[in-house]
């Protein structure tokens, strides 16, 4: 055997190790559609729900507990009846949850506490901003001018446009 030939031989180091076999489930869904959004079926139920705009991780856990769904299961492992129950609950705007957990409290027209999801939330936020502009509130005027709305300082941050820099005097 030549000296250099031992270096050219590749040894399979993983050959002795046993790899755990993945259990294939025929009912597993890799993509679950809820509220017009595709959710990754390989994520745990509360975490997958938090991918929806308007539902955070905490609300995802609360929804799973309210519907008696297992929080340690992946969303793709749920049965079709469970998924349908979940879809109906998420897409309903009124939840039987504490007020502090909802994202649209005391709606101006009806006075109800709602939790909006996905495009409903985006549309409602835009309508609220337009209402503030229409009634000429302080926040509405700040929105119109493109300035900071929530009381942040504007002296040094939030500048838009070209940066000019310091101009030196000509000598």
Curated annotation (Swiss-Prot):
It holds the Pfam family Ribosomal_S13. One of its GO terms (cellular component) is cytosol. The keyword Ribonucleoprotein applies. It comes from the Archaea. One of its GO terms (molecular function) is rRNA binding. Keywords: Ribonucleoprotein, Ribosomal protein, RNA-binding, rRNA-binding. GO terms for biological process: translation. Residues 1-24, 144-164 are annotated as: Disordered. The keyword Ribosomal protein applies. PROSITE patterns: RIBOSOMAL_S13_1, RIBOSOMAL_S13_2. Residues 1-11 have a biased composition (Polar residues). Gene3D superfamilies: 1.10.8.50, 30s ribosomal protein s13, domain 2 (4.10.910.10). Belongs to the universal ribosomal protein uS13 family. PANTHER family: 30S RIBOSOMAL PROTEIN S13/40S RIBOSOMAL PROTEIN S18, SMALL RIBOSOMAL SUBUNIT PROTEIN US13. Located at the top of the head of the 30S subunit, it contacts several helices of the 16S rRNA. In the 70S ribosome it contacts the 23S rRNA (bridge B1a) and protein L5 of the 50S subunit (bridge B1b), connecting the 2 subunits; these bridges are implicated in subunit movement. Part of the 30S ribosomal subunit. Forms a loose heterodimer with protein S19. Forms two bridges to the 50S subunit in the 70S ribosome. This is Small ribosomal subunit protein uS13. It comes from Thermoplasma acidophilum (strain ATCC 25905 / DSM 1728 / JCM 9062 / NBRC 15155 / AMRC-C165).
């Amino acid at each position: 055997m030549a000296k250099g030939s031992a270096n050219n031989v590749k040894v399979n180091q993983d050959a002795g190790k046993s790899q755990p076999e993945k259990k294939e489930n025929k009912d597993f869904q890799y993509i679950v559609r809820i509220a017009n959004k595709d959710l990754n079926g390989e994520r745990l139920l509360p975490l997958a729900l938090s991918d929806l705009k308007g539902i955070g991780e905490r609300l995802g856990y609360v929804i799973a507990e309210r519907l008696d769904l297992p929080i340690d299961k992946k969303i793709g492992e749920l049965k079709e009846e469970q998924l349908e129950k979940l879809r109906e609950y998420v897409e309903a705007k009124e939840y039987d949850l504490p007020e502090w957990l909802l994202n649209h409290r005391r709606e101006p027209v009806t006075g109800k506490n709602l939790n909006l999801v996905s495009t409903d939330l985006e549309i409602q936020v835009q309508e609220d901003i337009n209402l503030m502009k229409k009634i000429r509130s302080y926040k509405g005027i700040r929105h119109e001018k493109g300035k900071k709305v929530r009381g942040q300082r504007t002296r040094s941050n939030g500048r838009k446009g070209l940066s000019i820099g310091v101009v030196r005097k000509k000598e």
